Structure formats: C-alpha cells, structure tokens
Amino acid sequence: RDSXVTIVPLRNMRDIVYVGXITIGTP
C-alpha cells in the first residue's frame, strides 16, 4: 500500500516537471 502511495506523487511530479520543461522551453 505504501508503494502505491509513493508512485502516485512521483507520477504527478513527473508530469509537472514535463509540463514545466515545455513551458520554459517555449519562448
């Protein structure tokens, strides 16, 4: 159960970083 709880935040963090990289990459 703990592993599932840790995987969700990591996934959300990855999406945020991915979107953030695109926003910063675009002028």
Swiss-Prot record:
What Gene Ontology molecular function terms does this protein carry? Answer: aspartic-type endopeptidase activity
Q: What is its EC number?
A: 3.4.23.-
Q: Does the keyword Hydrolase apply?
A: yes
Biological process, per Gene Ontology: proteolysis
The species this protein belongs to is Capra hircus
Family assignment from sequence similarity: Belongs to the peptidase A1 family.
UniProt protein name: Pregnancy-associated glycoprotein 62
Q: Which gene encodes it?
A: PAG62
Expression by tissue, per the entry, reads: Placenta.
Q: How is it modified after translation?
A: Glycosylated.
Q: Which UniProt keywords apply?
A: Aspartyl protease, Glycoprotein, Hydrolase, Protease
